Amino acid sequence: MKKEVCSVAFLKAVFAEFLATLIFVFFGLGSALKWPSALPTILQIALAFGLAIGTLAQALGPVSGGHINPAITLALLVGNQISLLRAFFYVAAQLVGAIAGAGILYGVAPLNARGNLAVNALNNNTTQGQAMVVELILTFQLALCIFASTDSRRTSPVGSPALSIGLSVTLGHLVGIYFTGCSMNPARSFGPAVVMNRFSPAHWVFWVGPIVGAVLAAILYFYLLFPNSLSLSERVAIIKGTYEPDEDWEEQREERKKTMELTTR
């Protein structure tokens, strides 16, 4: 565990999660600013969030895995894909990055366009229970897309994971904005809420819904649909950060990284 934390690759990965979440929040929230001359459309916001996540997954995915979302990180922990310590540092970096991204946007946005900085809120008389279920479903489909499109065990061509994930985020926003402003990402909701000091009684929805949805997707994918053939000791080693995969696994992982491009050969 200590060896993992002290490695340069680990530090780079944590920084990549911080930077990616900062950029994601800046562009995503920026697309939702209410300019007096032109109010944002649902399609505009959905495309901005989707393009941002696709771009960042393409650019920084090979460094950290491109989680950019505490719900996805926790789901991968439950799915036995990352260590507990890595999950902790990733989530911390994502939350700090989200605050930084929202803070920068707050600083550069004119007062008449800033509004509430796109803080997530319940819309159209949606109840907290309804909102939680919506966020759960939206994040469930996103997590399934991420797990399937980045699974190193798949031998058939899967196209571009970055493009697939970006489209999944766009899809979620096209539906979710009407209910909750669409979170699917606790960091996306937490950042502007901190900067604006605006935590509504329903803020928990944007944590519980996405996390439960992503964790359910991890259980379904990694334990029921496509379970790993790992022993109990190997699973414990992964959680502790002491697991050392064999050379064949590493070769498959490197080959998988080559598919993180916008076109396939």
From Swiss-Prot:
Span of the secretion signal?
A: none
Which spans are transmembrane here? 13-33, 40-60, 88-108, 127-147, 159-179, 204-224
One BP term from GO: water transport
Q: Does the keyword Cell membrane apply?
A: yes
Give the residue ranges of motif NPA 2: 185-187
What this protein is reported to do is described as: Aquaporins form homotetrameric transmembrane channels, with each monomer independently mediating water transport across the plasma membrane along its osmotic gradient. Plays an important role in fluid secretion in salivary glands. Required for TRPV4 activation by hypotonicity. Together with TRPV4, controls regulatory volume decrease in salivary epithelial cells. Seems to play a redundant role in water transport in the eye, lung and in sweat glands.
| UniProt-recorded name of the protein | Aquaporin-5
Q: Which organism is it from?
A: Homo sapiens
Gene coding for it: AQP5
